[in-house]
Structures are given as structure tokens and as C-alpha cells.
């Protein structure tokens, strides 16, 4: 069939209209995605391929080509580091974008650097962040906004099933994108808590104290501010305060005065029964897991609900090991990706986030050695998800860590 010039103009205009429509849909998806209780993917049922064809996204892809994205992220886990090396190879071959993992011991190092840069061109293009660090960066206007509206695969986020719209009580509002989800759990032999009065698969402060009494010197938790240790303290405080609602808003002086003594009184009972009589603590959950593997500890802690199966499959822990959670629910939060407002390679950073939210990348993260749960609807495994407990407001994190250090850190 021969096309006239009028026909060619028609198809050209049609293509532009399709691109405009895709851009409008992408924006609509992201707006709906941040409304409570609305799943934009289900409402609009828009194929990702249509969002990817928008002129907005095509321009981002063009700008990203040849960029090197400096990704500041925790480097203390071999499975995570291996996963990021795999992702870097995939991103380079698919998008001609180079991903460089800048390993940090704690993301607060990157936050301090952004603060020192004071809004000038940043050496950081992408951050792995959540909690009080996100709260600070958002408050100081140091983050690029509208990420959900400019990254097509954000439409896959399982916002109806997972608590992905707030980060430690702080609304995300497009300033970061969920990458994975963590749920605090305890790994122990299935018989350990069977005679403590706890309901099946759950623990309580009193049942942990009973186990410590029966197994002196073989119970502990990572030293705060290591986040597993801090979260253990938060789980205790939620239980001891009977889920006092003041924990989920800013930590006022009165709330601290009323609630924190509950935690300190409990720890004063637990520590004399703990490893090193509470005079020393594992430096990380990795060290605690190692001591559990060596049978020096009777329990360990994790933020990955899939970790136990990985450990059992590789015969690093006994086959009788069991996953437990606090009776009030497992503290659940997302770990997220954010782009500094002053990033020099923001287009490339958006492409990296887009890939890391893809089914391919999320499946590799879930099924590979990391085993990190997915945050996208197509891969959500509700059967393996623990009953969730809301995270405490971000302000409680610093309060608990500082007060703990004053009382027990010397």
C-alpha cells in the first residue's frame, strides 16, 4: 500500500498523540499510586510497555545513555553486593548505563556528604535509604521529587498489599521508590519457645525472658544503632506498651518519660541473663547469626523473612530451625531508592530504579542468594508474608538509640 503525504502526517500525528497519552497515563498512575487504598495498576490496568513508550520516558532513556551512576549503598552483605554486580551487567547491556556501587558502612555517611555539599553538584547519584535518613533528607529538601510519576515500573508497586506509602511514619510522596521490604523475625529451634506460653510461631517479651533464664549466656541482640538491634528494642517497646499509639507519632518528652522506662526495666532483667551478662553485644546480625550457627546462641534475629530458608537449604543452621515473630506483628518497612536533587546523572539513576523494579530484577533479588522479598504485585507472595506491625515514627529511632547508649553503651 502506498502512503500519501496526508497519510504520513496522520500516522505521525497519531504517534505523537499516543506518546502524549502514555505520558498522561504515567502521571495518572503515579498520582493514584500515592492515594491510600488505591492500586493504580488495578485501576488503570495499563501495560508497562505503554508507559515506557511515553515521550517523557524516551527522553530520560536518551539522556541516560553513557552516564555512570554512583550508587551509595550499604556494602556489608556479600549476597547484596553480588546482586548489584549482576544488576550492573544487565543495566549496562540494556541501557548503556554504568552502575557503580559505592560501598558504605552506614548510609548516614552519604547523608553527611550530601549535607556538606550544600546543594552543589553532588558526587552521589542514587541512595539506598529509609527511616530517619530519609526523613532528614526530605525535610532539608535534598531529594529529587516526582519519582513515581517519572519511572514507569513504579506502577507495579504493590501498594494495596504492602505498607509502601510511608517510611517510618513519614509520607514518601514521590521522593523515594520502594525497592524491597523487610519484616523483623527471630530464628530459633522450633521447640525453644514451646513451653513459654507463647502462641504458635510468636514470641513475647516474657517468653524471651523465660528462654534467657533457661539458657543463660545464650541470648543477645545486635548492639544499637545497628538496625536489627534497634528494631529488636522497638518490638519490645511496642509489646511492653501494649501498642501505645504515641509510638507512631513524634516522640514528645512526655511520651518518652511515660514509655521508655518500660523498656529499660525489661532490659535490666534481660541483660544479666544474656551473653557476656549484657556487657557486650554482637556487632551485627551477621555476627549473631554466626554465633547461632556455632550453637553458642539459641536464637538470632533477621529482617528478611526468607533468610531462614536460605540458611536451611545450605545446611548452615539446623533443619529444625523455625521462624517466629512478635505477637503484635512483625515490624515491617520498605528499603528504598532515592535520587539527590543535585545528582549529576539523575536520568541514569531513574533508569537504574526502573530496572531494579522490573520483574526480572525483582525475581533475581527474591530467588538469588539475597532472598529479599519483592515489592511488585506480580511477584508478591502473600503466603510467606508475616502479619505486619506498623513501624514507629522515625523520631523514636534516634531517641531509643541515644538513651540506650547512655544506659548500656559504656
Located regions from the model:
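Early extracytoplasmic/lumenal segment of secretory-pathway proteins
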Residues: 42, 47-136
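Extracytoplasmic ligand-binding site segments that recognize negatively charged/polar headgroups
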Residues: 74-86, 105-109, 127-278, 282
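Hydrophobic residues within well-ordered alpha-helices
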Residues: 114, 137, 288-293, 339
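Alpha-to-beta junction loops
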Residues: 117-126, 142-143, 215-218, 294-299
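A ligand-binding cleft/hinge motif common to bilobed small-molecule-binding domains
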Residues: 134-136, 299-318
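A bilobed periplasmic-binding-protein/Venus flytrap-type ligand-binding module shared by bacterial periplasmic
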Residues: 187-192, 238-241, 333-348, 364-365
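Periplasmic-binding protein-like
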Residues: 266-273, 281, 305, 316-338
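Extracellular/periplasmic juxtamembrane helices and adjacent flexible linkers that interface
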Residues: 344, 355-410
